Amino acid sequence: MAESIVKLEIVLVCLAKFVKAVTQIEKKRLLQRKLEMKILGIGNAIVDVICKVNDNFLINNNLTKSTMKLVDEKEFQKLLENLKIERTISGGSVANSIVGLSQLGNEVGFIGKVSDDHLGRKYAEGLEKEKVKYHYNIKSESIPTGTCLILITPDSERTMCTFLGTAGKISEIDIDEKIVKQSKITFLEGYLWDKGDPQKAFNKAISSSSQSAMSLSDLFCVERHREYFLDLVKRKLNITFANEQEIMALIKTKNFKDVIDFAKKIKKLVVITRGENGAMAIQNDTIVECNAQKNLKIKDLTGAGDLFAAGFLHGHVNKLSLEESLKKGTELSSKIIQQVGARL
């Protein structure tokens, strides 16, 4: 009898240890799930100031339609002097994409820089409201939060004048490798190259990530940093987003067939928006196309590329086909251009 009791006690002790071990494993698993993000964005934290102008305003101020120009704070205020502000809203290219991804139900994060000022605090609060994690690095310094003057002409095209402010100070120190490693995809924007020391920050983010993606951002941005961008696209990035003009400028061609040949050769995923001609994804020898939606009441093209990227990445990270991912990108892009502002 005594021997049976001892054996039972041993069994109970072993069972208790087993249950404890399983519980600890389950806790670790749940914690890991909690920490995991599908997509982490790294980009300029910018507040958009939206104004409507005519073409003469662009001509008189030496602005090229549909592009982004970097300005200092004084020039920004001078441009704004005689304009009526239609709307002020948190923006930034990758941040817009990340918010769109969050609205689609994805776990997302954002790394960017704002100042400890009114706009910076509002920016951070806005991302918190959209359930974006790890989203800002507030700096108490004299440089204000970045702002972008978005000028919308009657044809709904947008021309941007950006004062980067604190957003342009992002550096290697701001890239937390632990956070990067928690995400399935790290999504960066070409605009980051315009200020500061982005090369080390980019390399740190890309080397720590499972998959890396980047938007080429803007035609002039490509022309400013073509050599670096070409190296990134060919050797380091898994996914590249660009519009037709940007990707053609990158490889210095006027023939779109050259773009297709280039994308096939590098054997990466290249996703291209083509305006009225729809969108295209090229991966190895596979080419998939999606038609643009027709008969839209276009109000503002500001967030078209940002929300397209959000829709495509949503499909990609959730293992949808290239065709389905393109359709999702086209769907979101079509929605955003029928309103003013780059966030749904």
Language-model segments: which ranges?
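Charged/polar low-complexity intrinsically disordered segments
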Residues: 3, 9, 24-27
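Glycine-rich phosphate/adenosyl-contacting loop at the front of the ribokinase-like
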Residues: 33-111, 121
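Glycine/charged-rich beta-loop-alpha catalytic/anionic-binding loops adjacent to active sites
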Residues: 74-85, 130-131, 287-296
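Conserved post-catalytic alpha-helical subdomain immediately downstream of the catalytic base
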Residues: 102-103, 265, 269, 293-344
